[in-house]
Regions:
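Hydrophobic or amphipathic alpha-helical targeting/insertion segments
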Residues: 88-91
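Thiamine diphosphate
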Residues: 1-81
Length: 91
């Protein structure tokens, strides 16, 4: 049986294998399994910022400085829409 914890772990392993070393989290109850799994995996430098818009722009700046991808992760619902301005700015 596949659990939420297993799915989170497998997802983060794939992200690590793709070369992502930084994740910026905007925490919420729905993405808690990803935060817990990322910490347990130990493959990432993690930052937690409660404001999604600030988190996305922080990730964009970090990506520009390091010239490497930075993952962003938020809870479900409209929280994702707050990432949109930084995503647009990235392109």
């Amino acid at each position: 049986m596949t659990t939420t914890k297993n799915t989170a772990h497998w997802t983060l392993e794939a992200i690590a294998q793709a070369g992502v070393k930084n994740i910026v989290f905007s925490p919420g109850s729905r993405n808690a399994p990803l935060i817990i799994s990322a910490e347990a995996l130990g493959a990432f430098e993690m930052m937690v910022l409660g404001d999604e818009r600030s988190a996305a722009f922080h990730a964009l700046g970090r990506s520009q400085v390091t010239e490497a991808p930075v993952a962003i992760c938020c809870t479900s619902g409209s929280a994702l829409a707050n990432y949109y301005p930084a995503v647009l700015e990235a392109y």
